Amino acid sequence: MPIKKPCLKLNLDSLNVVRSEIPQMLSANERLKNNFNILYNQIRQYPAYYFKVASNVPNYSDICQFFSVMYQGFQIVNHSGDVFIHACRENPQSKGDFVGDKFHISIAREQVPLAFQILSGLLFSEDSPIDKWKITDMNRVSQQSRVGIGAQFTLYVKSDQECSQYSALLLHKIRQFIMCLESNLLRSKIAPGEYPASDVRPEDWKYVSYRNELRSDRDGSERQEQMLREEPFYRLMIE
């Protein structure tokens, strides 16, 4: 007597649906790579950007003492259990996601308070493209700690478009902002600190360095350095 075999039918429709969605599931980084040339050309069409410097900003000793206070639209938080003092804009200018792009600023340990005094007008500026940043409380770190000898400032960059993308205007403002930070420190003859092994920077950046924290680690390596130098965001900052 013949054995009846069950009728097994592969549902190809579901596979087709998944397959059709694959081109749309590009990561934010891949989208930025695909749009690199367009953004590169658009950025160069913008004139130089001039940032309005904030007045009546706190000095370094002030923010080391505060627990939580509002300054120039930024909430400053200094928890006793944290080595960092955090600043976050109450009404963010960039409504998109954080996709890992950030900058460090490395200063000689003894000059961190002075560096903050020099940069605070820009960091608190209403024109600043940076909605969130932090600075090391030097009273809470050891002499040779990573964020004691360098990387005392961290600037977090958020996207401003759908799909975690950056507009050309925001990228232009960030480029100009970094240039202003660098030039102010250089003009004031601030001594640079030791920039992190996890980061990359071009030769003309003396204080600022870049890292994408979602695609790298703190230890750094030759392979990681090469990968970071190929990041489209970083290239749009320096090329």
From Swiss-Prot:
Belongs to the phosphothreonine lyase family. Catalyzes the removal of the phosphate group from the phosphothreonine in the mitogen-activated protein kinases such as MAPK2/ERK2, MAPK3/ERK1, MAPK8 and MAPK14 in an irreversible reaction, thus preventing the downstream phosphorylation of histone H3. This epigenetic modification results in inhibition of the transcription of a specific subset of pro-inflammatory genes, and ultimately to a reduced immune response against the invading pathogen. The diminished immune response enhances the bacterium's ability to disseminate and multiply within the host. GO terms for cellular component: extracellular region. This is Phosphothreonine lyase OspF. The active site is at H104, K134. It holds the Pfam family VRP3. It comes from Shigella sonnei (strain Ss046). Its EC number is 4.2.3.-. One of its GO terms (molecular function) is lyase activity. It is an enzyme of class 4 (lyase). The gene is ospF.
